[in-house]
C-alpha cells in the first residue's frame, strides 16, 4: 500500500485539498515586524484572570507591531461548554477595549481567515494531515 492509498483510506471523502485551502487563505501581506496573534479561549464559563492576561498580551503585541489580533473560540470541549460563555468572553474583552480584528460572533464573521470556531476547522486540518501522510511526513504513534 502506498502512502497515497493510506491517506485515501483514512480520509476518503474530503471535499477540498491543501491547494484549495492555501488559495483560500493566502499568506498575509504583513510588513516586517507585524505580528498576528490569537486568543483562543474555551467557552466553558467566565473569563478568568489568566485568560484575560493572555488576551491583553496578545492584543498589545499585535497592535504595537501594526499587526492583527484575532479571536478563535476553542469549542472542542463540548462536555464543559457553557451556552453563554462566548457572549461573556466578548463582553469582557469589549469592556476593556480589547476588540479583535478578526472573529466570529453571533453569526457574523469578521476577517478572511475563518472559520474562527475551532470545531468548524476540522476539514482544513484533515486536508493537511492527509497531505502529510501522502508525502510520508505523518507520524506513526504507537
Predicted regions and their residues:
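N-terminal Rossmann-like or analogous alpha/beta NTP/dinucleotide-binding catalytic cores
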Residues: 2-142
Amino acid at each position: 500500500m502506498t502512502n497515497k492509498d493510506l491517506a485515501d483510506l483514512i480520509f476518503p471523502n474530503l471535499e477540498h485539498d491543501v491547494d484549495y485551502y492555501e488559495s483560500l487563505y493566502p499568506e498575509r501581506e504583513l510588513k516586517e515586524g507585524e505580528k498576528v496573534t490569537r486568543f483562543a479561549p474555551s467557552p466553558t464559563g467566565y473569563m478568568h484572570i489568566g485568560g484575560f492576561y493572555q488576551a491583553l498580551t496578545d492584543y498589545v503585541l499585535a497592535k504595537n507591531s501594526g499587526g492583527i489580533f484575532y479571536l478563535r473560540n476553542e469549542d472542542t470541549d463540548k462536555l464543559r461548554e457553557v451556552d453563554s460563555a462566548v457572549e461573556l468572553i466578548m463582553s469582557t474583552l469589549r469592556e476593556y477595549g480589547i476588540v479583535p480584528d478578526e472573529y466570529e460572533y453571533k453569526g457574523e464573521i469578521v476577517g478572511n481567515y475563518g472559520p474562527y470556531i475551532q470545531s468548524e476547522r476540522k476539514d482544513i486540518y484533515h486536508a493537511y494531515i492527509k497531505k502529510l501522510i501522502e508525502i510520508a511526513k505523518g507520524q506513526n504513534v504507537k
